């Protein structure tokens, strides 16, 4: 793990010591190099102990998320170039430093062995994100969004710390590698029910569960492009990863404690998809679509079958890349038209034909068209939920139809129609932007050739 963590940390001196013209080139090139170094982790399995130590380890569940984290840093740096072009040099460097520290915290979170260590890093990721949102956001509402983000997440995760210390007293260890073998089955009592709630609530706020999701659209809409990308692609996955990790301690409580949350998620995914159909704000639409996709992951984790676990991990990776590319596209529109309102930026297909192709591909990926990896994840989740209860097929089917509807609605409102006259002199798309979209969409298409590397521990 150190072979990824130390190079990532060394990007910080690289940023501050690079000369003005070389900042973007250097950081992008070296962070891409780091993401290629992390790729061999995908093919190392549990029997291979080369990547285990007392503090860090990786297994088939954390490796895909780790690779996604490292892959996203160069893409975030590429996406931020335009909106930082007018900033002074020190501020550019500070921004990149924030992204790199966030990246380091995330890598350590995904590979932490100890649950308390995991918790500390889980909280530490809040600080760089908060600074990115409240310092470089576009409107003044960003402070409000930062408050929402911080207080929702902190309130959710305080009980987790208490629960973890209680589990430490109970079992004598919080080491993830040991705790798999030392867990006692928790008897059903009131205190254990609260223990379950305390453990799961932090991750459900982070996911976010429908009803606790109000911080997400706010944070997304106000964040700068890199903030939106990392929030959608990785910070939401922390919730799913934590749930997958902590449910193995909480057996057999989950089997009957999960019902209200399953209902909330199944209802919430339809509600948030329907909210998407009524959105005027492009970034807000993508944020709500994130909530509905993550609701599927919550359902999959709480059903607790091998198939649903595989579906959850596949869907997390797929959604990370998809929502990220949608935010990049929305940002490229925003940089040209200076408005996130969809009605004010219609008919862009005639002005940016190549961008229209990326829009089409991203929308089709979002509605889980084969051969993308989204389809693999959704199929696993739908089939496992159907075998858990037949009625869910109605809800899942409705959700899939509404997802297709709002994805196409987003595509048609931005690309088709007669373009408004105030945007007839916009710049064509840059090579940088096309590269950015290609680097998002290529993994999505290529992973479907070999999906087993992202199907998690149980494959």
UniProtKB/Swiss-Prot annotation:
The keyword Transcription does not apply. InterPro entries: NADH4_N, NADH_Q_OxRdtase_chainM/4, NADH_UbQ_OxRdtase, ND/Mrp_TM. One of its GO terms (biological process) is electron transport coupled proton transport. The chain crosses the membrane at residues 22-42, 60-80, 95-112, 113-133, 145-165, 194-214, 224-244, 257-277, 284-303, 308-330, 351-371, 391-411, 436-456. The keyword Oxidoreductase does not apply. Its EC number is 7.1.1.2. Keywords: Electron transport, Membrane, Mitochondrion, Mitochondrion inner membrane, NAD, Respiratory chain, Translocase, Transmembrane, Transmembrane helix, Transport, Ubiquinone. It is found in: Mitochondrion inner membrane. Core subunit of the mitochondrial membrane respiratory chain NADH dehydrogenase (Complex I) which catalyzes electron transfer from NADH through the respiratory chain, using ubiquinone as an electron acceptor. Essential for the catalytic activity and assembly of complex I. Belongs to the complex I subunit 4 family. This is NADH-ubiquinone oxidoreductase chain 4. It comes from Ceratotherium simum (White rhinoceros). The lineage of its organism: Eukaryota, Metazoa, Chordata, Craniata, Vertebrata.
């Amino acid at each position: 793990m150190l072979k990824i963590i130390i190079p990532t940390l060394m990007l910080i001196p690289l940023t501050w010591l690079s000369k003005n013209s070389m900042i973007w080139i250097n950081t992008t090139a070296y962070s891409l190099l780091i993401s290629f170094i992390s790729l061999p982790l995908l093919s190392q399995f549990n029997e291979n102990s080369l990547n285990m130590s007392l503090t860090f380890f990786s297994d088939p569940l954390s490796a895909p998320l780790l690779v996604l984290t490292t892959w996203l840093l160069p893409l975030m740096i590429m996406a931020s170039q335009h909106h930082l072009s007018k900033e002074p040099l020190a501020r550019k460097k500070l921004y990149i430093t924030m992204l790199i520290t966030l990246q380091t915290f995330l890598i350590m979170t995904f590979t932490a062995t100890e649950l308390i260590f995991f918790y500390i890093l889980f909280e530490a990721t809040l600080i760089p994100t908060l600074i990115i949102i409240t310092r470089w956001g576009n409107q003044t509402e960003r402070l409000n969004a930062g408050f929402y983000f911080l207080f929702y997440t902190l309130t959710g995760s305080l009980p987790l710390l208490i629960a973890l210390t209680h589990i430490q007293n109970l079992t004598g260890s919080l080491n993830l590698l040991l705790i798999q073998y030392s867990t006692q089955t928790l008897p059903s009592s009131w205190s254990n029910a609260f223990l379950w709630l305390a453990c799961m609530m932090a991750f459900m706020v982070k996911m976010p569960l429908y009803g606790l999701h109000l911080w997400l659209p706010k944070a997304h809409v106000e964040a700068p492009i890199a903030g939106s990308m990392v929030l959608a692609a990785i910070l939401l996955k922390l919730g799913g990863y934590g749930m997958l990790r902590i449910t193995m301690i909480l057996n057999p409580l989950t089997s009957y404690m999960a019902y209200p949350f399953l209902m909330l998620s199944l209802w919430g995914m339809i509600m948030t998809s329907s909210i998407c159909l009524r959105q005027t704000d492009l970034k807000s639409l993508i944020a709500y679509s994130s909530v509905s996709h993550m609701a599927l992951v919550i359902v999959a984790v709480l059903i607790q079958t091998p198939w649903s676990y595989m579906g959850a991990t596949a869907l997390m990776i797929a959604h990370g890349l998809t929502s990220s590319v949608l935010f990049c596209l929305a940002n490229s529109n925003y940089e040209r038209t200076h408005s996130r309102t969809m009605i004010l930026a219609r008919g862009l297909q005639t002005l940016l034909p190549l961008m229209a192709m990326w829009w089409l591909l991203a929308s089709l990926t979002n509605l889980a068209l084969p051969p993308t990896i989204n389809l693999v994840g959704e199929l696993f989740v739908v089939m496992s939920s159907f075998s858990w209860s037949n009625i869910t097929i109605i809800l899942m089917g409705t959700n899939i139809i509404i997802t297709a509807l709002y994805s196409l609605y987003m595509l048609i409102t931005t690309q088709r129609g007669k373009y408004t006259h105030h945007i007839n002199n916009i710049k064509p798309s840059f090579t940088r932007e096309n590269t950015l979209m290609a680097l998002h969409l290529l993994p999505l298409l290529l992973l479907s050739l070999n999906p087993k590397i992202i199907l998690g521990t149980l494959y």
